[in-house]
């Protein structure tokens, strides 16, 4: 039975990814969120639209490692783990950030990612014979942003950790990806930007990209950092270069 587990984020990317997998006909989707009301709303909408897919919901924070491990044990086997949960500190110069801002960013965006990935990889192998980890990251991991210093650093650190997990695993059995989902006009974004300031993305963009990553064609991208905007045919055309250059499309130092 194909099974997908998602940790959600409030901007709608997580829910859109759930819908994309449901559209593909997966047998089971498990959603984890701290907030019970949005969690129940997501369950009801998905169950109504795709009655053939089992929708499971669990309340909990990704920072609660014991809770995440318990949920994975209850699910027993999971084909695909999608990590969407993240925390973004208030916009401020690095000199104005508090130690708590930095600590919270790293606890949620790095340590929770590490613990959840490690716990998932320790679960039994599903009948499909492979596991997939999809980390919904941010361009902040690559682009310096002085007003989001801890956020960007934490997203880069998480991507680096996952690259290490990827290099230590047989890519036929375990595939691990990180990707930038795009820019979305949410209520939080509206506090700082106008709708016509840039061209905003549709949440279906990362949803369908995540679904493609979970499919059979993406194995050659194991351990890579990607953007949802990239054309998959162009990525496939880079397969030989990726095989020859382990550092290509990864987070690291360029000299």
UniProtKB/Swiss-Prot annotation:
PROSITE patterns: ADH_SHORT. Keywords: NADP, Oxidoreductase. InterPro entries: NAD(P)-bd_dom_sf, Sc_DH/Rdtase_CS, SDR_fam. SUPFAM superfamilies: NAD(P)-binding Rossmann-fold domains (SSF51735). The keyword Oxidoreductase applies. It is an enzyme of class 1 (oxidoreductase). Pathway: Secondary metabolite biosynthesis. Its EC number is 1.1.1.-. NADP(+) binds at residues 118, 151, 155, 186. GO terms for molecular function: oxidoreductase activity. It comes from the Eukaryota. The active site is at residues 137, 151, 155. Short chain dehydrogenase/reductase; part of the gene cluster that mediates the biosynthesis of the dimeric xanthones cryptosporioptides. The pathway begins with the synthesis of atrochrysone thioester by the polyketide synthase dmx-nrPKS. The atrochrysone carboxyl ACP thioesterase dmxR1 then breaks the thioester bond and releases the atrochrysone carboxylic acid from dmx-nrPKS. Atrochrysone carboxylic acid is decarboxylated by the decarboxylase dmxR15, and oxidized by the anthrone oxygenase dmxR16 to yield emodin. Emodin is then reduced to emodin hydroquinone by the oxidoreductase dmxR7. Belongs to the short-chain dehydrogenases/reductases (SDR) family. This is Short chain dehydrogenase/reductase dmxR3.
């Amino acid at each position: 039975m194909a099974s997908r587990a998602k940790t959600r984020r409030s901007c709608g990317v997580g829910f859109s990814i759930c819908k994309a997998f449901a559209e593909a006909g997966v047998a089971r989707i498990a959603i984890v969120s701290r907030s019970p009301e949005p969690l129940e709303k997501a369950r009801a909408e998905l169950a109504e639209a795709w009655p053939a897919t089992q929708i499971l919901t669990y309340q909990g924070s990704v920072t609660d490692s014991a809770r995440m491990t318990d949920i994975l044990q209850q699910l027993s086997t999971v084909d695909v783990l999608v990590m969407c949960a993240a925390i973004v500190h208030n916009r401020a110069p690095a000199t104005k950030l508090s130690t708590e801002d930095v600590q919270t960013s790293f606890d949620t965006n790095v340590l929770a990612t590490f613990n959840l990935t490690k716990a998932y990889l320790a679960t039994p192998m599903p009948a499909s014979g492979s596991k997939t980890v999809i980390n919904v990251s941010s361009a902040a991991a690559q682009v310096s942003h002085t007003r989001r210093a801890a956020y960007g650093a934490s997203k880069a650190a998480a991507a680096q950790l996952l690259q290490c997990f990827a290099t230590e695993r047989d890519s036929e059995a375990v595939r691990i990806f990180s990707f930038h989902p795009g820019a979305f006009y949410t209520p939080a974004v509206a506090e700082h930007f106008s709708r016509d300031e840039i061209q905003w993305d549709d949440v279906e963009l990362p949803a369908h990209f995540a679904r493609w990553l979970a499919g059979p064609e993406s194995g050659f991208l194991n351990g890579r950092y990607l953007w949802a905007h990239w054309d998959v045919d162009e990525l496939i055309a880079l397969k030989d270069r990726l095989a020859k250059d382990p550092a290509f499309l990864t987070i690291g130092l360029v000299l």
